Amino acid sequence: MDIKLINIGFGNIVSANRLVAIVSPESAPIKRIIQEARDRGMLIDATYGRRTRAVIITDSDHVILSAVQPETVAHRLSTKDDGTNTVDEVEE
């Protein structure tokens, strides 16, 4: 089984198989999701103090904040699916 890993900025990596959504943090419902995750202890801040540009929601209900654009994360995910970029892939 292949474990696909995605770089979400500043050396932070998440499992591509666990991603449910990659969204922009601008809307009120997403801000509410972020606050609820913070209250539950399920928020992971991977921004290194920079502005949050992407919110990643996983199948385990963790919410991850990233400082890279959602389009960039999606592009990295799509290059993984094509098999053209295998730098961050690990075989189990």
UniProtKB/Swiss-Prot annotation:
UniProt similarity note: Belongs to the RemA family.
PANTHER family cross-referenced by the UniProt entry: REGULATORY PROTEIN SSL2874-RELATED, REGULATORY PROTEIN TM_1690-RELATED
Name of the protein: Putative regulatory protein CA_C1717
Domain of life: Bacteria
Alphabetized InterPro entries for the sequence: RemA-like
